[in-house]
């Protein structure tokens, strides 16, 4: 059997109350030790400035201008043009009073100004603190105060919220710089509390008038404090040094250069995940290292397809929900084909899959099938796509397989956390044995599993499984102002992720469960709620699902947002002709959903206490606006409980009455 990872240490049986730990695994490129770091690339500033020297005239940052509610073509700034603006913005920050080590917030949607502000921070050893553009005033208050932010770059539509009375943090700011313009009214409002405001143009002008030499960072300096959006509690400030960022990018370069179809300065990345999220941030850093181009979506995910068609990216990265929607769209189109064409599509799918499973690359498995059927799907992704990367949560094997067959490009899953700079593990392109897995350790990190006895996971057992622990050079330095939490997750030099993994015989890592959000039901059984949501979410009737249980109850309940298309087909089969919202109130639909969830539970061999016993049917998907999900669409469990407390209580009341 081909092995994809190197075992560099054997496992150790637990004694004296200590848990057992499994073998330590590394990337094959690191089997004899971590490769030496490129001495020219030791900071985030090096990544950018070296590419400016090598690729001054390459397109770096692209955006679409909206005029009279019409979205125009992509416009571009070259590496040289971006560099000139970075120098001006950096000089303006210094003129406004920023000193090395000052914290600078960036609050808004992805755009060129976001990156220019970030690089200006790097140029002067300032600490960049991203804020999700979806944050409410409470979270913004917390981060600005906790990180002690002095200056903030803000999307123009966010400035008003910053200056509202319930957003108390504004008073500590020295300056607010708009991505575009600031109205006279808001400038006056800010001046009343002693805060200066600048338009982007004014700030550039100030930098030109008062130029300052750059003051680049050392490798050990803090590059950024990234606050995790968090599914519960206050956000955590994850401290990342310049060395960690640079090491990750160099490691990514080494990893990608192994493959025949390499990334180059001609590649184009579509950025639509929040830049405040580690996955997008590090993808962009990697693209800047290559001298490649990054184009930003125009701010509306509902019409992302339009940006894809206009930009024609070669690389897309997203969370599973993004790829699930792509899959749903393709499936919908297939349903509309006549039976003959659908039969041909399915036959070509099986034919290409068979050759992929024999080890052929996606481009050589079946050029005929690609030409007849699948190139049309590739065209829907712009026609030039070469790599799809899914991260943030597990992508179902069925969807990953479907994308590998039909998108005519490499499709891989990755795994990581903000604390590990996102890319802790990454799959191999064209290796079908990696379906449903997250691949192998990154070049500069090590992975091992640790026993979780209460869940029955043993890293030294027949099927080695346990909590995923990470050690290496691409790691955070700790949680900002929170040494207790840092000590809690860092034990003996290993970061404990809270995720449960399994090491397959070929050395590949598979995510199988979640230690975090682990609850104990009243009968003493442990349940991993997020794991169940991932499983039940694979059913076509489910668009969104939140599973709830607690230690005072013996059964699980859920709030389900059904898939409108699936519901409408179900209704048509039964002769119902009501609108979707009305169908969701039908008791027949509720029973149908419970039946479907039971079928999914049986298919996945779940334990009986993991079955969903009651559901509340919701018509509206969980959204960021109501603070029910994070910016990457992960359920905010505490907020969901507050929002649906009445429905939860009612479901348990009815379940109790049935038992009497």
From Swiss-Prot:
Compartments in which it is found: Endoplasmic reticulum
Q: Name one Pfam family in it.
A: AMP-binding
Note the PROSITE patterns from the entry.
Answer: AMP_BINDING
Enzyme Commission numbers on file: 6.2.1.3
Cite a single GO BP annotation.
wax biosynthetic process
Please indicate if the UniProt record lists Endoplasmic reticulum as a keyword.
yes
Gene deleted: what happens?
In stem, fewer and flatter wax crystals and disorganized cuticle proper and thinner cuticular layer. Reduced amount of wax in all chemical classes on the stem and leaf, except in the very long-chain fatty acid (VLCFA) class with acids longer than 24 carbons (C(24)).
Q: What class of enzyme is it?
A: ligase
**What pathway, per the record?**
Lipid metabolism; fatty acid metabolism
Question: Which residue ranges are recorded for the region named Fatty acid-binding?
Answer: 492-516
Q: Which cysteines are joined by disulfide bonds?
A: none
Q: What cofactor(s) does the depicted protein rely on?
A: Mg(2+)
Q: Does the keyword Ligase apply?
A: yes
**Which residues take part in binding ATP?**
225-236
Alphabetical UniProt keywords: ATP-binding, Endoplasmic reticulum, Fatty acid metabolism, Ligase, Lipid metabolism, Magnesium, Nucleotide-binding
This entry's Gene Ontology molecular function terms read: ATP binding; long-chain fatty acid-CoA ligase activity; very long-chain fatty acid-CoA ligase activity
Q: What is the recorded function of this protein according to its Swiss-Prot or TrEMBL entry? A: Activation of long-chain fatty acids for both synthesis of cellular lipids, and degradation via beta-oxidation. Acts in both the wax and cutin pathways. Preferentially uses palmitate, palmitoleate, linoleate and eicosenoate. Seems to have a specific activity against very long-chain fatty acid (VLCFA) class with acids longer than 24 carbons (C(24)).
Q: What is this protein called?
A: Long chain acyl-CoA synthetase 1
The gene for this chain is LACS1
């Amino acid at each position: 059997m081909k092995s994809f990872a190197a075992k560099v240490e054997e496992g150790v049986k637990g004694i004296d109350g200590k848990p057992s730990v499994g073998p330590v695994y590394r990337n094959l490129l690191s089997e004899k030790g971590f490769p030496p770091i490129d001495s020219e690339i030791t900071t985030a500033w090096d990544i950018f400035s070296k590419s400016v020297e090598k690729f001054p005239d390459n397109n770096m940052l692209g955006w679409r201008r909206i005029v009279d509610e019409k979205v125009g073509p992509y416009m571009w700034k070259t590496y040289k043009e971006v560099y000139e603006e970075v120098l001006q913005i950096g000089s303006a920050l210094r003129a406004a009073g920023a000193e090395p080590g000052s914290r600078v917030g960036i609050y808004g949607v992805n755009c060129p100004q976001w990156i220019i502000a970030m690089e200006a921070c790097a140029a002067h050893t300032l600490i960049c603190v991203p804020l999700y553009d979806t944050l409410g005033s409470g979270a913004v208050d917390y981060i600005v105060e906790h990180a002690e932010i002095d200056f903030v770059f803000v999307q123009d539509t966010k400035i008003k919220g910053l200056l509202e009375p319930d957003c108390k943090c504004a008073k500590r700011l020295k300056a607010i710089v708009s991505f575009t313009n600031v109205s006279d009214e808001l400038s006056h409002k800010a001046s009343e509390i002693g805060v200066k405001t600048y338009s982007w143009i004014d700030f550039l002008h100030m930098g030109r008038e008062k130029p300052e030499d750059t003051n680049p960072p050392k490798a050990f300096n803090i590059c950024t404090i990234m606050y995790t959006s968090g599914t519960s509690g206050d956000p955590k400030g994850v401290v990342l040094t310049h060395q960690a960022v640079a090491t990750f990018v160099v490691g990514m370069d080494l990893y990608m250069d192994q493959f025949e179809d390499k990334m180059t300065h001609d590649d184009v990345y579509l950025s639509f995940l929040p830049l405040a999220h580690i996955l997008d941030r590090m993808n962009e850093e990697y693209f800047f290292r290559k001298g490649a181009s990054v184009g930003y979506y125009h701010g509306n995910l509902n019409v992302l397809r339009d940006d894809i068609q206009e930009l024609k990216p070669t690389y897309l990265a997203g969370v599973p929900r993004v790829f699930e929607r792509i899959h749903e769209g393709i499936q919908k189109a297939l349903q509309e084909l006549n039976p003959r064409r659908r039969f041909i599509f399915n036959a070509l799918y099986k034919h290409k899959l068979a050759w992929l499973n024999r080890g052929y690359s996606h481009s050589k498995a079946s050029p005929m099938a690609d030409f007849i059927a699948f190139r049309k799907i590739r065209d829907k992704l712009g026609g030039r796509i070469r790599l799809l990367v899914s991260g943030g949560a597990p992508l179902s094997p069925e969807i990953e397989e479907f994308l590998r067959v039909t998108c005519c490009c490499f499709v891989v899953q990755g795994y990581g956390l903000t604390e590990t700079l996102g890319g802790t593990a990454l799959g191999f392109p064209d290796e079908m044995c990696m379906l449903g897995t997250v691949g192998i350790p990154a070049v500069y990190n090590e992975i091992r599993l640790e026993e979780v006895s209460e869940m029955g996971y043993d890293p030294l057992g027949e099927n080695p499984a346990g909590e995923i622990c990470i050690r290496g050079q691409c790691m955070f330095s700790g949680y900002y102002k929170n040494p207790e939490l840092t000590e809690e997750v860092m034990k003996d030099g290993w970061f404990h992720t809270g995720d449960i993994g399994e090491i397959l015989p070929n050395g590949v890592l598979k995510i199988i469960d979640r230690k975090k959000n682990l609850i104990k039901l009243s009968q003493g059984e442990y349940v991993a709620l997020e794991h169940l949501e991932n499983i039940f979410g694979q059913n076509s009737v489910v668009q969104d699902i939140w599973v709830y249980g607690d230690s005072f109850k013996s059964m699980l309940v859920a709030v389900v947002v059904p898939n409108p298309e699936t519901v409408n087909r179900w209704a048509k089969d039964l002769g119902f002709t009501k609108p979707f919202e009305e169908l969701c109130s039908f008791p027949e639909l509720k029973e149908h959903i419970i039946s479907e969830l039971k079928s999914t539970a049986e298919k996945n061999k779940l334990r009986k206490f993991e079955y969903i016993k009651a559901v509340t049917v919701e018509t509206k998907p969980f959204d960021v606006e109501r603070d029910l999900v994070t910016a990457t669409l992960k359920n905010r469990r505490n907020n969901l409980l507050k929002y649906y407390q009445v429905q939860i209580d009612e479901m348990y009341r009815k379940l109790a009455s049935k038992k009497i």
